[in-house]
Amino acid sequence: MCTVVDPRIVRRYLLRRQLGQGAYGIVWKAVDRRTGEVVAIKKIFDAFRDKTDAQRTFREITLLQEFGDHPNIISLLDVIRAENDRDIYLVFEFMDTDLNAVIRKGGLLQDVHVRSIFYQLLRATRFLHSGHVVHRDQKPSNVLLDANCTVKLCDFGLARSLGDLPEGPEDQAVTEYVATRWYRAPEVLLSSHRYTLGVDMWSLGCILGEMLRGRPLFPGTSTLHQLELILETIPPPSEEDLLALGSGCRASVLHQLGSRPRQTLDALLPPDTSPEALDLLRRLLVFAPDKRLSATQALQHPYVQRFHCPSDEWAREADVRPRAHEGVQLSVPEYRSRVYQMILECGGSSGTSREKGPEGVSPSQAHLHKPRADPQLPSRTPVQGPRPRPQSSPGHDPAEHESPRAAKNVPRQNSAPLLQTALLGNGERPPGAKEAPPLTLSLVKPSGRGAAPSLTSQAAAQVANQALIRGDWNRGGGVRVASVQQVPPRLPPEARPGRRMFSTSALQGAQGGARALLGGYSQAYGTVCHSALGHLPLLEGHHV
């Protein structure tokens, strides 16, 4: 019953396929019937179930309205109220895959990919931190990617603003939250009485290490085991570092240190890891939060120097002030009414995603320090839009290929060119250097060295690619509120797939690549017909 889609959603969007489902929601790939834009629709089940869920829904919507204009942060295009007054629909720009799927696939990320992905993550994190907002849940599955290696940070349900907290560190209490254990900072694991922006920098270090290693750096099976893996790898904390955490945490850390055997970070990484990557990792994975590199400092590190361009690294000049004080938890009806009020305000401003200030300037832009409207390379670098999807690709849909809105939202198509050339630290190309080809991320694992791939391996790669790539996408901008009154013209009915067309990727390992591609063998598969026998060469003395 939870998966029933409201009629207003069906009238506005053509649902293509389900991308994922969990205990709290479901995500579909869909096409806007009016514009042809490919989007991702997230339905949050019972979004206002209790105070915690209501607060998380409220935070995600408000913070995405504040930061969604950044080229490396996912854009919230629409917020739609469900008819049952419990669920809520969030419409996002569509991305092909996520970093977790790419890492699990193995062999797809080259050194230049790792550097560019991490640079874009640092750009997004710097923008958040400049508004004094901490994400608190940065992990590979929350880093979305496309084939142009463009990064979009998503899932702001656990993010919070530190601007409304008292200035005294003793008053910045840590609220309990459920984040993925493998990327939690030591102070979070130790239930320290305060936290800082350094929580995100630790998570970024874990993400970088996982991209370099191909698997998680600290895959703890419990909070205690997680802490043990960390403390036996990073340099031991000083007495001053332990005192800063509080007396309750100090005894726990000292007990865990003990006489356990130690290892170094370089022992966990491949032998060909660059010295710059190892140095950056060591500066991020530091026990004391105030001794870790900040996002601004990390952007100046030699590891990402080729992409570093200060004019393209946005920062806010003022803290983000949430619509509800972080230290005060509202009631469920109050959170619900505030979210619905935001939807009404968006609908009254011709589809814009932000409230307008006294001079028509949105709050997210009122204190934004960015030299240009859209971050891009110097004018000598050609700007290229998203690559067109081949007509022969599996699952190609003409409705997804062209987007009337795409031509109107040029500033949203600006992050891919950041990766199309090697730059000096000042954002200029080295003297005499030629323009580098566009950086793309092949989402299919390459086959053996120099050997021509067999038909079976080609089929297996194609099916695996279907499971990894979500499809083409077009960028958009601004939150819109769907109108229930307008009924768009009907599209021609889709061909209904047969039962054999489902779950081919999941059964590929058991049935083979060729069968997975065909969706199952027919009775004629693997047999030789009479006409084929007639063309076989006959040996001498055996003519009929």
Swiss-Prot record:
Modified residues (Phosphotyrosine): Y177
PXXXP motif repeat start and end residues: 371-375, 378-382, 386-390, 394-398
Start and end residues of each stretch annotated as Disordered: 347-413
Positions annotated to bind ATP: L19, G20, Q21, G22, A23, Y24, G25, I26, V27, K42
Motif TXY: positions: 175-177
Domain (Protein kinase): residue spans on this chain: 13-304
Keyword Transferase: yes
Effect on the protein of changing Q300A: Impairs interaction with PCNA. Associates with chromatin
Biological process, per Gene Ontology: DNA damage response; dopamine uptake; endoplasmic reticulum organization; intracellular signal transduction; negative regulation of cell migration; positive regulation of cell population proliferation; positive regulation of metaphase/anaphase transition of meiosis I; positive regulation of spindle assembly
Residues recorded as bearing Phosphothreonine in the entry: T175
Post-translational note: Autophosphorylated on Thr-175 and Tyr-177; activates the enzyme.
Impact reported for K42R: Loss of autophosphorylation and activity. Does not increase dopamine transporter activity. Impairs kinase activity. Does not rescue cilium assembly in MAPK15-depleted cells
Record EC number: 2.7.11.24
Result for mutant: T175A: Loss of autophosphorylation and activity. Still heavily phosphorylated at Tyr-177. Does not rescues inhibition of O-glycosylation in MAPK15-depleted cells
Activity modulation notes: Activated by threonine and tyrosine phosphorylation. Inhibited by dual specificity phosphatases, such as DUSP1. Phosphorylation and activation in response to DNA damaging agents, serum stimulation. Constitutively activated when phosphorylated on Tyr-177. Activity depends on the relative rates of MAPK15 autophosphorylation and dephosphorylation by PTPN1.
Similarity-based family: Belongs to the protein kinase superfamily. CMGC Ser/Thr protein kinase family. MAP kinase subfamily.
Entry note about domains: The N-terminal region (1-20) is the minimal region necessary for ubiquitination and further proteasomal degradation. The TXY motif contains the threonine and tyrosine residues whose phosphorylation activates the MAP kinases.
This protein's name: Mitogen-activated protein kinase 15
Gene that encodes it: MAPK15
